[in-house]
Amino acid sequence: MRSPTRFVLGHRAAVAAFLLAAACAAPAAAQVRVVSYNVTNMVGNATALRDVLKACHDDDSDGFAVPVGVFMFCEVHQSGLSALQAAVNAAAPAGYTYALATFTTSSSEDSASGAQAVFYRTDLFTEFAAGHADIFTGASRNADRWQLRMVGYDSTLARLYVYGAHLKASTGSANEAERLSGVQAMRSNADALGAGVHTLYTGDMNFYNNTETGYLAFFNAGNGQAWDPLGTGSWSGTGNAWKHTQSPRDITADGLVGGGMDDRFDFILPTAALDDADGLSVIDGTYRALGNDGNHYNTAINAGNNTFYPSNLARSNTLADNLFLATDHIPVIVDLQVPAKNQATLVAPPARVIQNAVGVNAQVRVSNAAPGLPIGVDAMSYTVAGSGVLSGTFNGTAPLTPSFNTVTLPVSTATVGLRTGTALATTPNQAAQSPSISLPVTVRIVRPSNPSLSSVADVNAAVVPGAATAGGAPVDVTIPVSNWGFNVDQSAMDITATQVSAANFSVVSGTATNIGGTPGSVVVRFNPASVVAGTYDAPVTIQTRDENIPGMTTASVVATVRITVTGGCAAADLNCDGVVDGTDLGLLLSQWGSNASGDLNNDGTVDGTDLGLLLSAWG
């Protein structure tokens, strides 16, 4: 059970902290606000009652306003039910609708103080009608039990049992015993629901002090054990005036009892399952008696000024006046946080990746999709774990949408083939929607491309022949380039550049793309216009790369283009006059050390070797 000090000290003092932390009364429609209110047979001022109900929605004294999720009303007669429903509907914020849960009464109950009625927000809850029960509590009265199920949640722990009761009034041992009997009947029913059930005991319990046996029976051990958000200490006297709920009036008139604010008759008592800050749970510091500023002990709530909203006296006084006119009780309110909603989306890795590529990842974006303010939504812990082609395990706390945390899972690229894996995003949070989300991943790991100068073997160097006529037209030589070994598990290949530097050679077409099973090619041109008969070699460097995917590699092959030139002059007949003689010798010597026509062996330099070749061809 919680320490009483935590809540007594945490009430009005905590308001300022909540106002700051919750961003100054921002709307928070997803939180579950619960109101317990004795409407005194609907004999009070109807307009004032409607305005009090509206104030229950608008109340931001603990940091945020939220349309009420559950109203539990006491002293409802069959004849007044339609008027109460009209008041609930008239006070509802735009866009929100309320449904009447199962309503039961009897002639004896209806002729006495009336029954209990629950109205719930249809966007938050549905009622499981079979979960309703009437529980006899004495004095011709029944307590009611309703089972409400949260919309958008599948977990059984997102269900809320609400007990509504109006126990026997007045002092005296006989009346106390009857109240005790009523509490014991509710506890017996709640205990039978099993462990861990989320339950609220609400209503006008008519307890006169904190030592009354009926009050204490709520805290007995068992599945339905309750705790008091205000602590179990005394609520008597001026120092506890802020806890009181009856009577907001100092006069008895028109069916409404006076006496001033000096009793705590109205309660919302949660069970332990709502005390763990996990899933559906009470938000600390939000339990309050609406309009009770703690300064009206034993007098009317609207006597003088009311300071329930310290910075807005007019608002406080208007609320106090309406409370005075509406009934002879004031509403008790508590706010509950809602369970988390796990949301995980995948940013998939590339569909194809080169083997042994580094830095390849899948990303998982994790968020808590439950709408509302952080204070009203269960903070969601998560784990994201990779399996198969993915690896790594990462933990964190998810922000509310639209924000998200990004978890990066490495992709293993060591093994070629179609690889699969799973990113599993889980949360241990109680009653969380989608507690486990499995995100499948598929990625194909491919070998690097493999340039080859042959389509039948892996060849990195080869001679490609060609023929030309001295002084004739240019000759184009096509060099085929294959992606050797290509299949679905190998990268396609691009030819990115072709380089040739030998005299009389040039590149005509030096690039190609997406070479797979069909070879590509480059084209090199030889111009024989100024050459003589002979053999001319040119190294051609062909550079390649993989397709543009992670891990892309580069490679190269070298083809030697060998052109055989026929016709025209002999190689040593430099002036082409039909005779190798002194004139040719003079031309060769004039070109000494250069790369010119006197380079008879095509080694790039006119030197002694070329001189020897010329002399051997003399005449």
What are these regions (language model features)?
Residues 2-16:
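Bacterial N-terminal signal peptides that target proteins for export
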Residues 13-25:
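Bacterial N-terminal signal peptides
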Residues 30-340:
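Divalent cation-coordinating acidic motifs and surrounding scaffolds
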Residues 69, 197, 330, 357-358, ...:
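Surface-exposed loop/turn positions
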Residues 82-87, 574-595, 603-619:
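Alpha-helical segments with a strong preference for the paired helices of cellulosomal dockerin domains
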Residues 338-568:
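Feature for long, exposed domains in two main contexts
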